[in-house]
Regions:
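Structural motif
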Residues: 6, 86-88, 115
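Conserved ATPase-coupling elements of RecA-like P-loop NTPase cores
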Residues: 92-103, 123-128
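Walker B catalytic acidic pair
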Residues: 90-92, 118-119
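Short recognition patches in nucleic-acid-associated and regulatory proteins
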Residues: 146-173
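Sensor-1/coupling segment of RecA-like P-loop NTPase cores
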Residues: 107-130
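Short basic (Lys/Arg) and small-residue
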Residues: 138
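Conserved P-loop
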Residues: 1-78, 122-133, 143-146, 167, ...
């Protein structure tokens, strides 16, 4: 039975690298896969051509999704032309709740495994919409570990401005010149001064 997987971490843990390598492994064995990534800054319901790229310079072509793209319909149409063996979704935190359920139907009704990769929380320590839904309904959760500057496991992400100061307010997604750093909870609180809850 196909499953819906969610692999999550803080920033810069290697999620995109692992996704690209996993997709390559399928293709190397002659299996067809479909890759998706957020076209977060695109508009409309059109599926855009996009690219998944990693910090270590690996890249792969992908379809881009915006919040209005019906992923179940898109995957079903593609699978009717070419049998698909797996679906890979990068930047899964940007999925809408509906899109997470659409991907669950890809696994449940079409029998195609769906592997989603994304951040768990934003720079304020809050769950992204897509991540929250995936944490709730995915068949299997996987955490990729990265480390804080102190050597402890990094579970949080801080957004720094151009001067290196932590930002504590603003849009959840911001494409301006920002720098993100992965931190353990203690150092995230020290840097941001935020104490959620």
């Amino acid at each position: 039975m196909a499953k819906l997987y969610f692999t999550y971490s803080a920033m810069n843990a290697g999620k995109s690298t692992i996704l690209i390598q996993s997709a390559y492994n399928y293709r190397e064995r002659g299996m067809e896969v479909m890759l998706w990534t957020s076209a977060h800054y695109g508009d409309g319901a059109a599926v855009e051509q996009a690219e998944i790229s990693s910090r270590i310079s690996l890249s792969a072509e992908a379809c881009g999704f915006t919040p209005t793209v019906d992923l179940f319909t898109q995957v079903r149409a593609a699978a009717s032309k070419t049998p698909l063996h797996a679906i890979f979704v990068d930047e899964a935190q940007f999925l809408s709740r509906d899109q997470v359920w659409q991907l669950s139907r890809v696994a449940d009704q079409l029998g195609i495994p769906v592997m989603c990769y994304g951040l768990r929380t934003d720079f304020q320590g809050k769950l992204f919409e897509g991540s929250a839904e995936l944490l709730g309904i995915a068949d299997q959760l996987r955490e990729i570990r990265t480390i804080c500057h102190c050597g402890k496991k990094a579970t949080m992400t801080a957004r720094l401005d151009e001067s290196g100061h932590a930002q504590t307010a603003g849009k959840q997604v911001d494409i301006d010149k920002q720098h993100y750093v992965s931190l353990c909870r203690r150092h995230w609180e020290d840097v941001t001064g935020l104490h959620p809850g």
